[in-house]
């Protein structure tokens, strides 16, 4: 059995990873060692059926004794520890949820239902750094993988509807707190059937604009609104989140020529499911039934939702998908621009295939 160290296992992504590993009995195949950046010496969790104490996540000697390190601790930790470990001669496998190493030449972005061939080639060629991808990119490829695998995609334009969880646990709490403030502000009026809805709306809007809602994490109110910008601003007018779409898609697929991917990334008031609306330029006219067959056959989690109003409203929403590994795709139809133009709408859990699941499956391959 390999010695596997876990850092950042208590955070949101780490907690989902632990839950999935317990469900799949992954701990049966490894010797887990749990680390902490702040609580060393305290009792370690018993996920693996073993007892012990939390180790120091900054102790290079302890880390060097590991065969595999899995970190969900974030980019600052990776930037501090990873170079020191490699410079010390450590030759173990590093599996990371943070974005810091994604675009490095000696790292592979992991999404095995989509790029197992790239992962296998990397392992055969001595690659030892494996990084989870951007959540929207991973979820897009899980849902639309059949089109990419059959070399049918000329370019992709996307508008995202990204959940609060993409920012982190504090962002989710802030969204719910904002919702509570707004409701509490008009609760009496809502309980009075004769109250005027426009008066209620004015009270809500006034509070939203008042500066009284908690916005420490988002910077502006999200409840009852949206934020059409995610991550840093780049010189070309993109947000960094939008830049990742093309950069990471092409690295994951190891394309020989770049597939253009661009669009707008928007934060909305969903909790943990990202949704995306796509305009896809196909390389040739492909019938909708064939498109549906290719998408459904690509991986066990891609589910084609018929382009029917009632079915779509039931099955193609964050409420329906949250907490599941299913990555449904629907609203598939040809657009007025021509027979090569396809619309699609996808939904996926940002914490599962968007974050924890690719890490878990990579660890399973290595262990």
Curated annotation (Swiss-Prot):
This is Aspartate-semialdehyde dehydrogenase. Changing residue 135 to A: Complete loss of activity. Substrate binds at residues 162, 241, 267. HAMAP family: ASADH (MF_02121). The active site is at 135 (acyl-thioester intermediate), 274 (proton acceptor). Phosphate binds at residues 102, 244. Catalyzes the NADPH-dependent formation of L-aspartate-semialdehyde (L-ASA) by the reductive dephosphorylation of L-aspartyl-4-phosphate. Its EC number is 1.2.1.11. Homodimer. Is inhibited by L- and D-cystine, and by other cystine derivatives, via the formation of a covalently bound cysteine at the active site Cys-135. It catalyses: L-aspartate 4-semialdehyde + phosphate + NADP(+) = 4-phospho-L-aspartate + NADPH + H(+).
């Amino acid at each position: 059995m390999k010695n596997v160290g876990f850092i950042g296992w208590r955070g949101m992504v780490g907690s989902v990873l632990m839950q999935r590993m317990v469900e799949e009995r992954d701990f049966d195949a490894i010797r887990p060692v749990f680390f902490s950046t702040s609580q060393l010496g305290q009792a370690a969790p018993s996920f693996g059926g073993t007892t012990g104490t939390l180790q120091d996540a900054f102790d290079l000697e302890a880390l060097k004794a590991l065969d595999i390190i899995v970190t969900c601790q974030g980019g600052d930790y990776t930037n501090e520890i990873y170079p020191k470990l490699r410079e010390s001669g450590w030759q173990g496998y590093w599996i990371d949820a943070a974005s810091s190493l994604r675009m490095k030449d000696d790292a592979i972005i992991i999404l095995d239902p989509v790029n197992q061939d790239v992962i296998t080639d990397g392992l055969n060629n001595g690659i030892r750094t494996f990084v989870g991808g951007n959540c929207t990119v991973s979820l897009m490829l899980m849902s639309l993988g059949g089109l990419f695998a059959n070399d049918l995609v000329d370019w992709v334009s996307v508008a995202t509807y990204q959940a609060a969880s993409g920012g982190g646990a504090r962002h989710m709490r802030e969204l719910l707190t904002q919702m509570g403030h707004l409701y509490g502000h008009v609760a009496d009026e809502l309980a009075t059937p004769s109250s005027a809805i426009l008066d209620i709306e004015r009270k809500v809007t006034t509070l939203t604009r008042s500066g009284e809602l908690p916005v420490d994490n988002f910077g502006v109110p999200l409840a009852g609104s949206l934020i059409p910008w995610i991550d840093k601003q780049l010189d070309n007018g993109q947000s960094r989140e939008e830049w990742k779409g093309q950069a990471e898609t092409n690295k994951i697929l190891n394309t020989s020529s770049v597939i253009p991917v661009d669009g707008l990334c928007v934060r909305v008031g969903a909790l943990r499911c990202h949704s995306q609306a796509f305009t896809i330029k196909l390389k040739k006219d492909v019938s909708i039934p064939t498109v549906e067959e290719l998408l459904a056959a690509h991986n066990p989690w891609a589910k084609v939702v018929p382009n029917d109003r009632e079915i779509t409203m039931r099955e193609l929403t964050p409420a329906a998908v949250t907490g599941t590994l299913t990555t449904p795709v629907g609203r598939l139809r040809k657009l007025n621009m021509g027979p090569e133009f396809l619309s699609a709408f996808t939904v996926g859990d940002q914490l599962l295939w968007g974050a924890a699941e690719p890490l878990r499956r990579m660890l399973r391959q290595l262990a």
